[in-house]
């Protein structure tokens, strides 16, 4: 075979290979196109089913938290959560916080908290003992988790706050601004729906615990005025994040701050802090039309801090050691009352739950149950109530629960910061145990040295 024949033969072979390759590519493209067309057709056919499923899930997820049931009968308190945020924050990214509280929807419980716009063990944690600053925000995370930038959801700019779920969406109330003109911003499902302006221009403030919802309406209590004298107190009724009614309490010689509110048989009961002159706790109860009654817990087992030793109570303010105070709570059961309080009478340390079977109306100091929560040698702080509705628990009653803030740092410890972790308990009618569940962090941190 001469050179020309070789060239022709090689060229012919290459041409045949090229044609075969081209045909294979065309066949492959046709196959891909047909396959894609079939898949697209299947997707188009499935879309109505997908939309139907989505709408069905939303319908199931949206309920009305009735709040018409009574509180569950209980014999003690079972531990529900502990976030250990200060211990974890010595090494991890954890927010500097105060005023944590818990609230539950019909699907989940979340911890809400007021951040300081800073992380533990960081330079911006310096000076965070201050209550009110433009850097404070209300955020939330799943209950029991340490609040960090990775698991937390922004809710509102706030140095005083409340939040609750009506069965459809979260309502948040965040107060921010100057002391002489603060404004409460109401959000429903994350959207601003209303505002409330300070009416006395003297540190408008609210609960620092959950608001209470009944039959689609939610209720909160706010204070405006002196922290050491007669102030003004209002109850607000909200629907889908908008104020629909409010009433100012006619309460001379009463002092209400940082109320802990809960629904019970279709009405709302709030147990509050008297920072003026009471070492027992004031209460206000009201129906859905905001018709209210007021009083003080009569028991000689006093619930505030500081307070005198237990003795003879009063259905008005008990004056000895009555000035100042700490946020707290109680649960009313007929004439009886579960009282949560610090173990110490003069510092925010220790915590215990006491059942006084006659304490709502009786003035003696006898009680029948005491359950230890935090030892007197460990720091506690604010405490407050929350509830779990039957729509969450499957019970036929409203389960009472409470949380305790475990404050660490300034002003009692040698740090540059103030923050806290939290624990929570829920009422049960079965076996429980008393113990101590302290914060447990070893201080100071690296930033403090």
From Swiss-Prot:
It catalyses: Hydrolysis of alpha-(2->3)-, alpha-(2->6)-, alpha-(2->8)- glycosidic linkages of terminal sialic acid residues in oligosaccharides, glycoproteins, glycolipids, colominic acid and synthetic substrates. It is a single-pass type II membrane protein. Catalyzes the removal of terminal sialic acid residues from viral and cellular glycoconjugates. Cleaves off the terminal sialic acids on the glycosylated HA during virus budding to facilitate virus release. Additionally helps virus spread through the circulation by further removing sialic acids from the cell surface. These cleavages prevent self-aggregation and ensure the efficient spread of the progeny virus from cell to cell. Otherwise, infection would be limited to one round of replication. This is Neuraminidase. Its cofactor is Ca(2+). Residues 28-449 are virion surface. Residues 11-33 are annotated as: Involved in apical transport and lipid raft association. Residues 1-6 are intravirion. Glycans are attached at residues 68, 126, 215. Intact N-terminus is essential for virion morphogenesis. Possesses two apical sorting signals, one in the ectodomain, which is likely to be a glycan, and the other in the transmembrane domain. The transmembrane domain also plays a role in lipid raft association. Residues 71-449 are annotated as: Head of neuraminidase. It comes from Influenza A virus (strain A/Chicken/Hong Kong/YU22/2002 H5N1 genotype Z). It comes from the Viruses. Ca(2+) binds at residues 274, 278, 304.
């Amino acid at each position: 075979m001469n050179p020309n024949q070789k060239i022709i033969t090689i060229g012919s072979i290459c041409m045949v290979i090229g044609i075969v390759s081209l045909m294979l590519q065309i066949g492959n493209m046709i196959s891909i196109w047909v396959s894609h067309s079939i898949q697209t057709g299947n997707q188009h056919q499935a879309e109505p089913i997908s939309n139907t499923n989505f709408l069905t899930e939303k319908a199931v997820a949206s309920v009305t938290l009735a709040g018409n049931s009574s509180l569950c009968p209980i014999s003690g308190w079972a531990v529900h959560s502990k976030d250990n945020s200060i211990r974890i924050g010595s090494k991890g990214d954890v927010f500097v916080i105060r005023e944590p509280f818990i609230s539950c929807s019909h699907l989940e419980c979340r911890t809400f908290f007021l951040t300081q716009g800073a992380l533990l063990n960081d330079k911006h944690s310096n000076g965070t003992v201050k209550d009110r600053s433009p850097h404070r925000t209300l955020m939330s995370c799943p209950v029991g988790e340490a609040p960090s930038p990775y698991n937390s959801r922004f809710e509102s700019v706030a140095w005083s706050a409340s939040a609750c779920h009506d069965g459809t969406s979260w309502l948040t109330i965040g107060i921010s601004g100057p002391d002489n003109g603060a404004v409460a911003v109401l959000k429903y499902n994350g959207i601003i729906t209303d505002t409330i302006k300070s009416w006395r221009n003297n540190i408008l403030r609210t609960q620092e615990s959950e608001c209470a919802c009944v039959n689609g309406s939610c209720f909160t209590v706010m204070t405006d005025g002196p922290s050491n004298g007669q102030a003004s107190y209002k109850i607000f009724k909200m629907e889908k994040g908008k104020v629909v009614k409010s009433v100012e309490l006619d309460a001379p010689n009463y002092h209400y701050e940082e109320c802990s509110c809960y629904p019970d048989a279709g009405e709302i009961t709030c147990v509050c802090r008297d920072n003026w002159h009471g070492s027992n706790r004031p209460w206000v109860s009201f129906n859905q039309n905001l018709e209210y009654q007021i009083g003080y817990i009569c028991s000689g087992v006093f619930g505030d801090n500081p307070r005198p030793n237990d003795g003879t109570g009063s259905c008005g303010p008990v004056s000895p050691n009555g000035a100042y105070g700490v946020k707290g709570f109680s649960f009313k059961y007929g004439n009886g009352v579960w009282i949560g309080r610090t173990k110490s009478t003069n510092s925010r340390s220790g915590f215990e739950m006491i059942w006084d079977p006659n304490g709502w109306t009786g003035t003696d100091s006898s009680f029948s149950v005491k359950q230890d929560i935090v030892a007197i040698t460990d720091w506690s702080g604010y405490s407050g109530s929350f509830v779990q509705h039957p729509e969450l628990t499957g019970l036929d009653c409203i389960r009472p629960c409470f949380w305790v803030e475990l404050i660490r740092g300034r002003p009692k410890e040698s740090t540059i910061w103030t923050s806290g972790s939290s624990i929570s308990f829920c009422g049960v009618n079965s076996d429980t145990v008393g113990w101590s569940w302290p914060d447990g962090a070893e201080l100071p941190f690296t930033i403090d040295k």
